[in-house]
Design a protein with these regions (language model features):
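FIC/Doc superfamily catalytic core
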Residues: 1-400
Length: 400
């Protein structure tokens, strides 16, 4: 893959039809892009080494060892060597973690990520901070977020993880999923369990977690907008009633909508500045999300797009809805029973592409609509759904 003036076009790798190269390119792209959260840039040597790994010439471990050796033997010292060394080593470590398939949703995993990400960079890698911290933020005009107390860090992490582990995503549409994920991720970040490297560690943990619950997050959002991601986390956790500033997850939600739903919300750091001058204020046209017809990044194992329905109020061209209506018929089915009836296993994707569209278009309803989380909740066809089912049973060719 060609390079021009030290620039690597990582996105080209996703278009060449070689999945392994595309995966390695995504890992390096994200790893390099995340250095921007601390104002760091990688060296040209790192970029050249990354390309060698992407092309399959060397392994990721060989790439990391080359980077380590490069700084050990470098004789021509430059003023920014220390910063470059951190960026290069951390990029290699992050690329390795992202490329790995294993993941465990736990506090030890988060701590382990920090240790492996900053191995050879921070002496305190993998250690919870022993003191309280403040950080002046540009986006807050020099003010700081209130971070977690040093005495409570592990307890706070365990609590947030357990709350997320127990959270039930069933029945949620993607708007609700994004809103919840934004709150969870911002909560973990607000604890700020480490002395340094919290945002990079949080980003890597988030990527691995999203993948573990079925999302494809290989669209380079973390690579291109890592600084925005950090500032959005700041705004989601900052409140100053005296100055009229409330916690605002809107910016983080826009990031996740772009990441998970394929939207194209404008991600500009200046829009997040608290009490901005008029020329930097968010234009009215950017406050609303830009909807996409279907999410561009979604859990795998079901159709990659939601077919649009036609204009008739009693039928639809959406094959997912047709399949679900046919499966339910005159029965009342639980979510688990519906998954079995349509032959799918990925619950979140089924919700996004089949059940939610069927309910929003009025073909399927809840048996207990006033109690969505009823322990014996079932789903059944509406009058409209029954009319469609009758048509389908008369003309089975519509399902083909």
């Amino acid at each position: 893959m060609s390079q021009k003036e030290g620039y690597i076009n990582f996105e080209e790798y996703s278009q060449v039809g070689e999945p392994q190269k595309a995966e390695r390119a995504y890992a390096w792209s994200t790893a390099i892009g995340l250095q921007a959260v601390d104002g760091l840039t990688v060296s040209q040597y790192l970029k050249d080494t990354a390309v060698r790994n992407i092309e399959g010439e060397i392994s990721i471990d060989e790439a990391r060892e080359l980077i380590k050796t490069y700084y050990q033997t470098k004789t021509n010292r430059e003023p920014d060597d220390e910063e470059k060394q951190e960026a290069d080593k951390v990029s290699g470590n992050i690329a390795k973690i992202i490329a790995e398939q294993s993941f465990s949703f736990s506090v030890p995993t988060l701590i382990s990520f920090h240790r492996h990400i900053f191995e050879g960079v921070f002496k305190h890698a993998g250690e919870l901070r022993p003191y309280d911290i403040t950080k002046k933020e540009w986006v807050l005009r020099g003010d700081t977020v209130l971070y977690g107390r040093s005495q409570d860090l592990r307890m706070a992490l365990e609590y947030d993880m357990e709350q997320e582990r127990q959270f039930d995503y069933s029945g949620l549409n993607m708007d609700q999923v994004v809103e919840h994920l934004a709150k969870f991720v911002s909560g973990i970040w607000q604890i700020h369990p480490f002395r340094e490297g919290n945002t990079r560690t949080t980003a890597v943990f988030t990527i691995k977690y999203l993948r573990s619950i079925g999302f494809d997050v290989t669209n380079h959002l973390f690579s291109m907008h890592s600084w925005y991601f950090r500032n959005a986390l700041v705004r989601a956790n900052y409140q100053n009633i005296a100055k009229g500033v409330q916690r605002d997850t809107r910016f983080l939600e826009q990031f996740f909508r772009n990441l998970l739903m394929g939207e194209r919300n404008e991600l500009r750091n200046r829009y997040m500045l608290v009490n901005p001058p008029e020329e930097l204020a968010v234009p009215a046209s950017t406050t609303a999300s830009t909807p996409a017809s279907t999410p561009a990044s979604t859990p795998s194992n079901t159709p990659a797009s939601t077919p649009s329905s036609n204009c008739s109020p009693f039928t639809t061209d959406n094959e997912n809805i047709l399949r679900l209506v046919k499966a339910i018929g005159h029965r009342q089915l639980s979510l688990k029973e519906m998954l079995a009836a349509v032959g799918l296993k990925d619950r979140m994707n089924f919700m996004e592409y089949s059940l939610t569209p069927a309910m929003s278009e009025g073909f399927v309803c809840l048996l207990y609509p006033d109690k969505p989380r009823h322990p014996r909740q079932k789903y059944l066809l509406t009058v409209k759904g029954s009319a469609l089912y009758n048509e389908l049973t008369k003309d089975a060719s519509k399902l083909n």
